[in-house]
């Protein structure tokens, strides 16, 4: 009932020619602006109150992803202030009856609803708000082309195309490149989403494809190659080959090191064996040099004594069939100094016979002993 009363009251005032309240006018409710450029949002007002000292102008911004409007500009009594992210970017009009603002350097995130609100106390009736929808136009960014599925013959695949930026939303078109010709692809294609369904890939469908994203500001394109295997296969093959090469290198290094260690071990063993073989020979030589003279050599030495000894003492040497005549100790026991060197070790006759003698000393024993005794017998038996 009350609402009907107010409606009737406003109608009567209009018919009477009496206009009370603030009237806000928005000439353009939809505004498009290119990214990076400036835009002027026009908002005018009319009031029945002559005094403008308490007049206030407020602009708010409502983004499609926000939950409530945000104040970006406020002016009262001729004092204006820009607020939030629009600070230093908004300039308001100083003309009476004009509440317009100019925003510089518009960005894609500035797209949304702008609300102009004018209030003048005591003038409470009328339309004091107006709205403007602003769209910041952006050329489509370079789209991203991709393959869904395995790009091999007989496998179902689809091609996708998407531009991250673009206002208004771009429309997508697919083309197949055949040499210098560009052939539009129309079947199984959605221009709004940019998805091209190919199905089971055949040799006829292999080739180069191009996707173009278009809006009122321009277009951008991307290309995709269906003539080579899917990149994932190449990555797997590359990883396998790299791993195989790494294993071969490791095996080669281990084999080389083991071979080198083995060679050093053989050389060390060979040197040790040579040293071991030389030690007994050295001991034998030292022992041979330090041994006493054999009995045969002593007999030969007696046989080669000077003749004066035989003449003066004929009984000193006897034949093999006679008893030996004792000789004076000074004449029969010449002192022979042992050679300087290691201590002589006496050895039994059996040990002397078993040890090998040098080649020059191997003479027949009868010849060395009998010949001198035969000659003595001739001398002794006249």
UniProtKB/Swiss-Prot annotation:
Disulfide bonds: 43-116, 161-211
Residues covered by the Ig-like V-type domain: 22-133
Cytoplasmic compartment segments: 256-382
Chief location: membrane
Cited PROSITE patterns: IG_LIKE (PS50835)
InterPro entries with a match to the protein in the record: Ig-like_dom, Ig-like_dom_sf, Ig-like_fold, Ig_sub, Ig_sub2, Ig_V-set, VSIG1
Segments forming domain Ig-like C2-type: 140-227
Transmembrane intervals: 235-255
Compartment(s) where it occurs, according to its Swiss-Prot or TrEMBL record: Membrane
Membrane-related topology note: Single-pass type I membrane protein
Protein name: V-set and immunoglobulin domain-containing protein 1
Organism of this sequence: Bos taurus (Bovine)
Taxonomy of the source species: Eukaryota, Metazoa, Chordata, Craniata, Vertebrata
Gene: VSIG1
């Amino acid at each position: 009932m009350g609402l009907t009363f107010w409606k009737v009251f406003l109608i009567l005032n209009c018919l009477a020619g009496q206009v009370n309240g603030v009237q806000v006018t928005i000439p353009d409710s939809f505004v498009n602006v290119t990214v990076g450029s400036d835009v002027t949002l026009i908002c005018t007002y009319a009031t029945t109150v002559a005094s403008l000292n308490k007049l206030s102008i407020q602009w708010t911004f409502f983004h499609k992803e926000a939950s409530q409007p945000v104040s970006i500009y406020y002016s009262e009594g001729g004092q204006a202030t820009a607020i939030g992210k629009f600070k230093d970017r908004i300039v308001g009009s100083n003309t009476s009856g004009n509440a317009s603002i100019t925003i510089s350097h518009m960005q894609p995130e500035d797209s949304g609803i702008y609300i102009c609100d004018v209030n003048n106390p005591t003038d409470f009736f009328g339309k004091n708000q107006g709205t403007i929808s602003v769209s910041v136009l952006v050329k489509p960014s370079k789209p991203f082309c991709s393959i869904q599925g395995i790009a091999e013959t007989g496998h179902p695949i689809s091609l996708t195309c998407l531009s991250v930026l673009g206002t208004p939303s771009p429309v997508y078109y697919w083309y197949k490149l055949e040499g210098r010709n560009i052939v539009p692809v129309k079947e199984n294609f959605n221009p709004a989403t940019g998805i091209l369904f190919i199905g089971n890939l055949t040799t006829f469908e292999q080739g180069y494809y191009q996707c173009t994203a278009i809006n009122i500001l321009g277009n951008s394109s991307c290309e995709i190659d269906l003539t080579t295997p899917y990149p994932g296969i190449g990555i797997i093959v590359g990883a396998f080959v790299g791993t195989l090469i790494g294993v071969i290198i490791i095996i080669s290094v281990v084999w080389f090191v083991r071979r080198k260690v083995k060679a050093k071990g053989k050389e060390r063993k060979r040197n040790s064996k040579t040293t071991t073989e030389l030690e007994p020979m050295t001991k034998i030589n030292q022992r041979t040099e330090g041994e006493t003279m054999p009995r045969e050599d002593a007999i030969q030495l007696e046989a080669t004594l000077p003749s004066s000894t035989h003449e003066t003492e004929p009984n000193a040497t006897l034949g093999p069939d006679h008893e030996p005549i004792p000789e004076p100790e000074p004449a029969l026991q010449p002192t022979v100094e042992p050679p300087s060197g290691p201590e002589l070790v006496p050895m039994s006759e059996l040990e002397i016979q078993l040890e090998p003698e040098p080649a020059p000393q191997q003479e027949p024993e009868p010849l060395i002993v009998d010949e001198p005794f035969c000659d003595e017998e001739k001398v002794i038996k006249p």
